[in-house]
Design a protein with these regions (language model features):
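Nucleotide-activated donor-binding/catalytic signature segment of Leloir-type glycosyltransferases, i.e.
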Residues: 270-293
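Nucleotide-sugar-dependent
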Residues: 31, 239, 288-295, 302-324, ...
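Conserved donor-binding/catalytic core segment of Leloir-type glycosyltransferases
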Residues: 19, 222-239, 245-248, 259
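N-terminal subdomain of nucleotide-sugar transferases
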Residues: 1-68, 94, 181, 246-249
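Glycosyltransferase donor-sugar binding loop
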Residues: 56-59, 202, 232-236, 257-270
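A short, well-ordered alpha-helix in the C-terminal region of glycosyltransferases
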Residues: 363, 370-385, 391, 397
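Conserved acidic donor-binding segment of nucleotide-sugar-dependent glycosyltransferases
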Residues: 346-354, 363-369
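Carbohydrate-associated surface elements
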Residues: 188, 201
Length: 405
C-alpha cells in the first residue's frame, strides 16, 4: 500500500466505508481498479483516511482490484425479501465514522441513511452516473396493469423484487438531500443534484509514458503494421464508435485501424460493430488497469467520440484521462465536460460528425509532431487537474467540512 501523501488541509484519520451496490464482475468489479469506487478509495487513503469497501455481489464472484490494497467486504446479493436479511448482515459489519454511498440507490444511499438513523454516522453521497437515464430519465413512469403489478411483486424474480428497480431509483433521488455531503464528477450531475464537483483522478505515476515503449506495445498486440486509433473502453452506442468507423470508411486508408480494448460487458454491441466494420477493427481483450498504460502506449491517437445523450453528459470518460496522462494526441467531441477537461490540449469536433472526425484524423497524422506536443500539454493538464493527487485535495476539503460540522 502506498504511503498517504501530503495534501492541502490534511485531514485526521477518519474511518470511511465506501458502500457499493454491486461489486461483482458484472458490476463495479468488472474493471478492476479503474472505476470510481477504487479511485475514491485511493484518493481517500492519500489523505490519511482508513478506508474499506463494502458491497453486494449479484450473480458471480467479486472483482479483484488490481492497484489498491483497500479491504473489500462483500455479501451475496439477493432479491426481496431475502435482500433485507442480506442488508442487515452487511450493516452489522460496518465500522465507520463516514459512509460514502456510491450513487442514489436503495442498496447504497438507502442503507447508508438507515445506518445513519441508527448510529449517527455521517453520509457522503457520490453520484457518478444518472441511473434513471438508462430508463428514460425524467420521462420514466411505472404504470403496470394490475396483472403485471401482481407478477412484479409475487414472482420470485418479479421486477419489483430487484432492490434497485427504476421505481426505487426514482424514490431515492428524492432523498439525495438527506446526505450530509454530495460529490459528483460532471457539471451535468452538479446542475441536477448539487454537491461538490470532484472529477475522476488518474494515477499519473502508473500512466507515465516514460515508463513504456510504444514499439514494444505494438509488437505485443500485433499493431506494428498500422497507425492506431484507440478506444480504451467498452463500446456502447452513445460513445460514438460508429462515427469513428464511418470516418475510417471515408478515409479508406488501409494503414489505419481502430483498436477497441475490451468488449461490451452489457450486450453484443461490439459484435455488431465487427460484423459491419470488421475491416477496421482490432479488438483486444479486457485488460487489468495495471496493463492499460502499456496498451495505450501503442496508440497514435486516442478517440473519445461521445454523442450528446443524457448518459454521456452524466459520465466522466476515463479513457480521456488515460490518453491525457500518457501524453497521447486526443480526438474528442464537444460533449459534456470534455471541452473543459481537454481545453487546448487536444482536438475537438462536434458530436456525430464522421466527416469532421475524418478530416481531423488526417490533420493529426499529417502534423504528428505538433500533435505529440499537444499530447505533452495534455499530460501536464492531467497532472495538475485530473490526477489522484488533485482528487485527494478536493476530497480533503469535503471530509474536513464534515469533521468540523
Amino acid at each position: 500500500m502506498r504511503t498517504a501523501m501530503t495534501v492541502n488541509a490534511r485531514v485526521a484519520s477518519p474511518k470511511i466505508s465506501i458502500l457499493v451496490s454491486d461489486l461483482s464482475k458484472q458490476g463495479a468489479g468488472r474493471w478492476g481498479g479503474a472505476v470510481r469506487t477504487f479511485l475514491l478509495a485511493q484518493a481517500l487513503e492519500r489523505i490519511g483516511a482508513r478506508v474499506k469497501i463494502y458491497g453486494f455481489v449479484f450473480g458471480d464472484d467479486p472483482g479483484e482490484p488490481t492497484v489498491s490494497e483497500v479491504p473489500m467486504i462483500t455479501v451475496p446479493g439477493e432479491y426481496y425479501p431475502g435482500f433485507i436479511g442480506r442488508s442487515r448482515a452487511l450493516l452489522k459489519q460496518l465500522d465507520a465514522d463516514i459512509i460514502y454511498a456510491l450513487r442514489p440507490k436503495p442498496t447504497t444511499l438507502g442503507l447508508a441513511l438507515w445506518h445513519k438513523r441508527n448510529t449517527g454516522c455521517q453520509v457522503i453521497l457520490d453520484i457518478d452516473d444518472w441511473e434513471l437515464s438508462w430508463h428514460g430519465g425524467d420521462r420514466y413512469r411505472y404504470r403496470p396493469s394490475l396483472k403485471q403489478l401482481a407478477q412484479d411483486i409475487l414472482k420470485p424474480r418479479g421486477a419489483l423484487r430487484y432492490p434497485d428497480h427504476p421505481l426505487y431509483l426514482r424514490w431515492m433521488e428524492s432523498r439525495v438531500c438527506e446526505a450530509d455531503a454530495i460529490t459528483v464528477h460532471t457539471q451535468f450531475l452538479q446542475t441536477r443534484f448539487g454537491g461538490v464537483k470532484i472529477p475522476n483522478g488518474k494515477d499519473t505515476e502508473l500512466f507515465n509514458p516514460q515508463a513504456y515503449d510504444p514499439q514494444l506495445s505494438r509488437q505485443a498486440y500485433g499493431l506494428s503494421d498500422y497507425r492506431i486509433l484507440m478506444f480504451p473502453g467498452a463500446p456502447r452506442p452513445y460513445k460514438g464508435i460508429e462515427d469513428v468507423l464511418q470516418a475510417l470508411d471515408r478515409l479508406d486508408d488501409p494503414t489505419l485501424r481502430l483498436v477497441i480494448v475490451g468488449g461490451s460487458p452489457y450486450d453484443d454491441y461490439d459484435q455488431q460493430l465487427m460484423q459491419r466494420w470488421g475491416r477496421w477493427i482490432i479488438q483486444l481483450p479486457p485488460q487489468p488497469v495495471t496493463k492499460m498504460p502499456f496498451v495505450v502506449a501503442g496508440a497514435d491517437i486516442i478517440v473519445v467520440p461521445q454523442r450528446e445523450t443524457p448518459a454521456a453528459l452524466a459520465q466522466f470518460p476515463l479513457k480521456l484521462t488515460d490518453g491525457m496522462s500518457m501524453a497521447k494526441p486526443i480526438l474528442a467531441t464537444r460533449v459534456g465536460d470534455i471541452p473543459e477537461i481537454l481545453q487546448d490540449a487536444g482536438y475537438l469536433v462536434e458530436p456525430e460528425a464522421p466527416e469532421a472526425i475524418a478530416q481531423q484524423i488526417r490533420w493529426i497524422l499529417d502534423h504528428f509532431q505538433d500533435a505529440q506536443q499537444r499530447g505533452a500539454s495534455a499530460r501536464q493538464r492531467c497532472i495538475e487537474h485530473y490526477s489522484i493527487e488533485a482528487m485527494s485535495g478536493l476530497l480533503s476539503d469535503v471530509v474536513r467540512s464534515l469533521q468540523l460540522s
